[in-house]
C-alpha cells in the first residue's frame, strides 16, 4: 500500500481479501478494488503492477480532505423549500476523529445537528450526536387535516457502529429525547391524544444490509433493515409502569427484467409493543420518503400527507419502473397496508390500498419528479412535485 495510514493496512487487507506473497486472478483484483473504493475510507484508490513480469501489485490511495463544506437546496409541493448546510472536520490524530455540523431550514422542519465520531478504524466508530429540531406538523386522517402541532425536539445519542462486514452495518446505543409542545390544535372533536412536554430514555439496535448500486434509481441489489427500540423515562420504566418498545422491518429488492425495466418489490412494517404508549412514537404512514417528518414514518403511495395508524402496521408494495431516453423514468406503484392495535389480530385489521403514476428525471441536482396518486384513504386525486435530493 502507498499513501495509506499504516494503522489502516491490516483491515484494508482483511476486507479486500488480499494476502501478501500470494497470487490472485484478475477477477479477484477487480473485486478487491471495488471493496476498497466502496469502503469510502480514501478519496481515490488505484493500482499498478511492477516487476520484470509485472508480478508485484502496488495499491495507491489518496487521503480525503481534512474538511469539507456542502450545500443542498430542494423544493416540493408540500414544504415548498428546504436548505441544508453541512460542514465536517477530520482530525487525523492517533485516534481518528470526525466532527460534523448539519443545519437545515425549511417550511416545516428546521434543525441543527452536531456529530462527533471516534474511529477505531474507518468502519468502526464510537458516535456522539446532538440535534435540536423545530417542527410544524400537520396530521391527517383519510385526507382531512385533524390537527396541527408545533414543537421543539432535543435529541442526544451515544452509539457504536460497525460496518466492517461488506455491505452490512450494525449500530446500537442509548438515546435521550425531549419533546416540548408549543401548541396542539385540533379540528372539531378530534382531541384523542393527550400530549405534554416529556423526556424519554431509550436503548436501540439496528442492522442494515444493502447492496444497491445507487441511492436513487438502483438497477440491482437488495436492502434489508431491522431495528428495535426500548423506551423508558428513567432507564427501567415508563410513567411508573412497564416500558414500551418498537420493532421495525424493511425489505426492498430490485429485479432487473431488462436493461431498462425493473420491478422493485417491498415489504415493510412496524409494531409497537406494550400498553403504555407515548404519542411521539406512534406509527405514522404517508408520503414518498421514509422518515420524512418523524423517524418512524413509513411511505405509502396514495397518501401524500402523514397519518397516524394503529400499533401494528404492515405494507406490501410493488414498484414497476421503466427507464426511457437516458435518465428519464416512468414509475407505476401499487401498495397495500393493513393495521390493527393488536399484532396477533393484524389480519383482521383495517385495509388500505393505494397507487401512483409518476415521471422522474435523474439530474445532477437530484431527482426531479411529478407524481399523481390516489387511495381509499381520500376521495380526490393527489399530486406531488419534487425537485432535488431528499433531506
Question: What are these language model-derived features?
Answer:
Residues 6-8, 17, 22-216, 285-299, ...:
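Gram-negative/organellar outer-membrane beta-barrel architecture
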Residues 261, 267, 273, 350, ...:
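Predominantly the C-terminal beta-signal and adjacent terminal strand-loop region
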Residues 166-168, 259-261, 326-328:
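Secondary-structure transition into beta-strands, especially the periplasmic turns and strand N-termini
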Residues 68, 73, 200-324:
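C-terminal outer-membrane beta-barrel translocator/porin domains of Gram-negative envelope proteins
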Residues 319-353:
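C-terminal hydrophobic structural anchor segments
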Residues 146, 304-307, 341-347:
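Short, glycine/charged-rich beta-strand-loop motifs at protein surfaces that mediate ligand recognition
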Residues 133-135, 177-179, 227-235, 270-274, ...:
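Short glycine-rich beta-strand segments
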Residues 1-3:
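A short, amphipathic beta-strand motif
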Amino acid at each position: 500500500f502507498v499513501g495509506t495510514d499504516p494503522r489502516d493496512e491490516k483491515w484494508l487487507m482483511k476486507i479486500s481479501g488480499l494476502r501478501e506473497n500470494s497470487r490472485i486472478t484478475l477477477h479477484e483484483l477487480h473485486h478487491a478494488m471495488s471493496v476498497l473504493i466502496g469502503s469510502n475510507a480514501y478519496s481515490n484508490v488505484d493500482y499498478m503492477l511492477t516487476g520484470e513480469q509485472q508480478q508485484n501489485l502496488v495499491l495507491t490511495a489518496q487521503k480525503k480532505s481534512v474538511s469539507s463544506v456542502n450545500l443542498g437546496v430542494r423544493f416540493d409541493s408540500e414544504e415548498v423549500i428546504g436548505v441544508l448546510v453541512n460542514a465536517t472536520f477530520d482530525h487525523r490524530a492517533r485516534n481518528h476523529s470526525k466532527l460534523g455540523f448539519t443545519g437545515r431550514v425549511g417550511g416545516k422542519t428546521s434543525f441543527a445537528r452536531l456529530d462527533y465520531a471516534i474511529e477505531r478504524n474507518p468502519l468502526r466508530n464510537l458516535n456522539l450526536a446532538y440535534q435540536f429540531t423545530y417542527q410544524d406538523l400537520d396530521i391527517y386522517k383519510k385526507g382531512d387535516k385533524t390537527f396541527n402541532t408545533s414543537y421543539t425536539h432535543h435529541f442526544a445519542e451515544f452509539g457504536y457502529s460497525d460496518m466492517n462486514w461488506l455491505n452490512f452495518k450494525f449500530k446500537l446505543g442509548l438515546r435521550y429525547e425531549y419533546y416540548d409542545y408549543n401548541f396542539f390544535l385540533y379540528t372539531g372533536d378530534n382531541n384523542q391524544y393527550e400530549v405534554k412536554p416529556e423526556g424519554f430514555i431509550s436503548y436501540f439496535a439496528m442492522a442494515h444490509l444493502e447492496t444497491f448500486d445507487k441511492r436513487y434509481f438502483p438497477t440491482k441489489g437488495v436492502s434489508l433493515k431491522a431495528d428495535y427500540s426500548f423506551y423508558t423515562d428513567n432507564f427501567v420504566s415508563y410513567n411508573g409502569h412497564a416500558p414500551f418498545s418498537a420493532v421495525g422491518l424493511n425489505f426492498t429488492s430490485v429485479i432487473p427484467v431488462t436493461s431498462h425495466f425493473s420491478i422493485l418489490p417491498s415489504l415493510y412494517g412496524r409494531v409497537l409493543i406494550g400498553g403504555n404508549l407515548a404519542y411521539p412514537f406512534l406509527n405514522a404512514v404517508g408520503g414518498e420518503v421514509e422518515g420524512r417528518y418523524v423517524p418512524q414514518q413509513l411511505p405509502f403511495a396514495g397518501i401524500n400527507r402523514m397519518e397516524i395508524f394503529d400499533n401494528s402496521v404492515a405494507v406490501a408494495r410493488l414498484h414497476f419502473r421503466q427507464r426511457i431516453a437516458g435518465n428519464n423514468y416512468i414509475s407505476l406503484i401499487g401498495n397495500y397496508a393493513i393495521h390493527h392495535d393488536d399484532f396477533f389480530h393484524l389480519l383482521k385489521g383495517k385495509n388500505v390500498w393505494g397507487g401512483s403514476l409518476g415521471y422522474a428525471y435523474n439530474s445532477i441536482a437530484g431527482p426531479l419528479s411529478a407524481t399523481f396518486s390516489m387511495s381509499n384513504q381520500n376521495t380526490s386525486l393527489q399530486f406531488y412535485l419534487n425537485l432535488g435530493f431528499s433531506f
